[in-house]
């Protein structure tokens, strides 16, 4: 009778250990894949992320916003010309060189507006290059050895009773669910960032049109700061994910499986909070309003 109960207990333990290992395998696989997935997403330029949306935004910008930018350029250049003439002792001290200066400013302003998308794409190409370089370093140093980790944990699980294994299986299920929710939140953050990029790019000709004027130029300058902040937000996202992966990799080899799992849950919450803060951090770094 005792041997039968022992066999039943061992069968239950084997079943629970198998379930726990399955949950852990899925969990660690998600962690490894998430680093690569986020790198692929945040490294996309507006033209590469979704070609259809990009063409729509570019069409709206060129057909709707550029004419408005042309009106703004006209106003800015007229204001600039009047200021240049009147500031020289009320027309009594005029220099023909100022007109060459004005024509140069006009040419620069028109060139910037007509090449707005080239300028904007250059900013995001820089951001993509930085993110791609970071992805290679981060993913190469933080990939979790799933087989070795599971084997190490199995040694500890074999010494547990049925009740403790049942509790551990529930813990792994909850942590795995937490990671799934985190994946959804990360998707929301990444898609929200791209939508913000498209909205910012769509109106680019208007702030760019003001850059040739001293008084209005701060509008265009601040706009470019915001563009660089959006481009380098991807790098900050990669840094957050890299820190997350390193911390999880360190907790996996902890002596207490329960402690390691709850640490994973805590780091997951911290990661989500950090990702939400990357946008404001990037803007503060580039001093963009």
Stretches with model-predicted labels:
Residues 1-72, 88-97, 107-178, 217-222, ...:
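Gly/Ser-rich, low-complexity
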Residues 175, 179-211, 225-247:
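Alpha-helical transmembrane segments of helical membrane proteins, especially in multi-pass transport
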Residues 67-79, 197:
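Hydrophobic alpha-helical transmembrane segments
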Residues 81-94, 183-187, 215-216:
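Membrane-water interface regions at transmembrane-helix termini and the short interhelical loops
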Residues 75, 120-123, 127, 185-188, ...:
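Membrane-embedded alpha-helices of multi-pass transport/permease systems
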């Amino acid at each position: 009778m005792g041997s039968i109960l022992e066999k039943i207990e061992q069968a239950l333990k084997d079943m629970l250990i198998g379930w726990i290992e399955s949950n852990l395998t899925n969990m660690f696989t998600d962690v490894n894949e998430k680093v690569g997935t986020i790198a692929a997403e945040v490294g996309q330029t507006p033209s590469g992320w979704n070609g259809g949306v990009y063409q729509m935004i570019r069409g709206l910008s060129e057909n709707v916003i550029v004419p408005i930018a042309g009106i703004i350029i006209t106003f800015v250049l007229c204001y600039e010309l009047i200021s240049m003439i009147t500031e020289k002792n009320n027309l009594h001290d005029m220099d023909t060189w100022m007109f060459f200066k004005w024509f140069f400013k006009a040419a620069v302003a028109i060139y910037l507006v007509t090449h707005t998308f080239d300028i904007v794409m250059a900013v995001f190409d820089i951001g993509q290059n930085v993110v791609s370089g970071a992805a290679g370093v981060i993913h190469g140093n933080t990939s979790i050895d799933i087989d070795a980790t599971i084997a190490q944990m199995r040694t500890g699980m074999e010494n547990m009773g049925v009740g403790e294994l049942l509790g551990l299986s529930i813990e792994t299920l909850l942590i795995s669910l937490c990671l799934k929710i985190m994946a959804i939140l990360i998707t929301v953050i990444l898609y929200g960032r791209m939508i913000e990029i498209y909205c910012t790019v769509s109106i680019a000709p208007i702030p760019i049109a003001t850059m040739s004027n001293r008084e209005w130029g701060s509008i265009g300058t601040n706009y470019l700061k915001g563009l660089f902040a959006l481009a380098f937000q991807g790098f900050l996202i990669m840094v957050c994910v890299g820190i997350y992966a390193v911390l999880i990799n360190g907790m996996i080899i902890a002596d207490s499986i329960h402690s390691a799992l709850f640490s994973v849950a805590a780091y997951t919450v911290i990661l989500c909070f950090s990702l939400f803060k990357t946008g404001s951090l990037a803007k503060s770094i580039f001093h963009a309003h």
